[in-house]
Amino acid sequence: MLRFAPSPTGDMHIGNLRAAIFNYIVAKQQHKPFLIRIEDTDKERNIEGKDQEILEILKLMGISWDKLVYQSRNIDYHREMAEKLLKENKAFYCYASTEFLEREKEKAKNEKRPFRYLDEWAALEKDKHHAPVVRLKAPNHAVSFNDAIKKEVEFEPYELDSFVLLRKDKSPTYNFACACDDLLYEISLIIRGEDHVSNTPKQILIQQALGSNNPIVYAHLPIILDETSGKKMSKRDEVSSVKWLLNQGFLPEAIVNYLITIGNKVPKEVFSLDEAIEWFDLENLSSSPAHFNLKYLKHLNHEHLKLLDDEKLLELILIKDKNLLGLLRLFIEECGTLLELKEKISLFLEPKDIVKTYENEDFKERCLVLFNALKSMDFQAYKDFESFKKEAMRLSQLKGKDFFKPLRILLTGNSHGVELPLIFPYIQSHHQKVLRLKA
């Protein structure tokens, strides 16, 4: 079984979605079940409703699952596993207070050495009746694993101390809950971000202590860097939020296409998730950081906009008039996102606001002169744009750019865009909506 294990503590990050996509693809390729595990044991950081938001985003991206579990419902199992390790003398109670440990950390910082927990501290404050934590005994050997992307990774004994499994309130730590659940659900491969590399040896040690004979294969994805700063994309960067991208008018299909593409060798530029399942290979992923490029994502989104069928296009733009489909297709050629497309069609159909938009009084006057001329014309009476244009010029007595710029603005709401002869048939059929001015 493969899994994706998000925490409901904030908006889904593009790095998390990328991991979800890759786990889903490999599960499909290997004909294995796919598990979604909501890691909700951190009650203080959980945000109500974020779990459902995550699931909705996954559905939008075309990702389905065979099993959905909430980690918090396995706490009794986690405590049972901790008790097992205590009985087998693989774990121990530690009574050291938070204050004591903070003092030791400060001392290490002042002495410019890494902090390392010492087992001899475990019973120092036992007589003070502190609630104890449970710690796994530190290894006396190196921990190594063969990462599918990073290749051989090794941690020396001095890099791993006796770390906490259960907190004072008997709640499991992230690494303990994660390792226990991966055993419970027989997870065979984990694809996740490289920020988890330091967690991996701890989870391996926990599983070994619990008697696991089926080592998990790990693949740690390189981080995604910001295209301008070159720094790791933070959750605070709005562009790193999947929700933000969707709200900006990026199609789920384009986001999936892009996240599979970056840092990867792909056989074609534009593809679907189902197509990627046919050829995706972890071996083709680069071990170097990927750079997020919003401009290229917009390009891919433009290509996916063109692939939308008529029904889906009308649904997304919230338009029921099928007679506008041809116009939408023309506008798509100039748009990178749904938001841009919606704006173009809205400007076309809504009353034009020349008073608020343009400061030049002479220009506004020309617009009004032309508007009155156009209002007197029967749009349906003209066989083509050329004959319509000549009559409008005659009636308004305007010519050159004094005519064409006001004309485009009055008919489309934009000072530039698709050639007017191409959209004239749609202007004719919708002229009563098109030719309106805001009061």
From Swiss-Prot:
Protein residues bound to ATP: 235
Cellular location(s): Cytoplasm
S-adenosyl-L-methionine among keywords: no
GO biological process: glutamyl-tRNA aminoacylation
Pfam families: Anticodon_2, tRNA-synt_1c
Domain of life: Bacteria
Entry keyword set: Aminoacyl-tRNA synthetase, ATP-binding, Cytoplasm, Ligase, Nucleotide-binding, Protein biosynthesis
Molecular function GO terms recorded: ATP binding; glutamate-tRNA ligase activity; tRNA binding
Motif 'KMSKS' region: where in chain: 232-236
Motif mapping: 'HIGH' region: 6-16
Any one cellular-component term (Gene Ontology): cytosol
InterPro entries in the cross-refs: aa-tRNA-synth_I_cd-bd, aa-tRNA-synth_I_codon-bd_sub2, aa-tRNA-synth_I_CS, aa_tRNA-synth_I_cd-bd_sf, Glu-tRNA-ligase_bac/mito, Glu/Gln-tRNA-synth, Glu/Gln-tRNA-synth_Ib_cat-dom, GluQ/Sye
EC number(s) recorded for this UniProt protein: 6.1.1.17
Catalytic activity entry: tRNA(Glu) + L-glutamate + ATP = L-glutamyl-tRNA(Glu) + AMP + diphosphate
Gene3D superfamilies associated with the record: 1.10.10.350, HUPs
Function description: Catalyzes the attachment of glutamate to tRNA(Glu) in a two-step reaction: glutamate is first activated by ATP to form Glu-AMP and then transferred to the acceptor end of tRNA(Glu).
HAMAP family: Glu_tRNA_synth_type1
Entry-linked NCBIfam families: gltX_bact (TIGR00464)
Assembly mode: Monomer.
Protein name per the record: Glutamate--tRNA ligase 2
Organism lineage string: Bacteria, Pseudomonadati, Campylobacterota, Epsilonproteobacteria, Campylobacterales
Gene name as annotated: gltX2
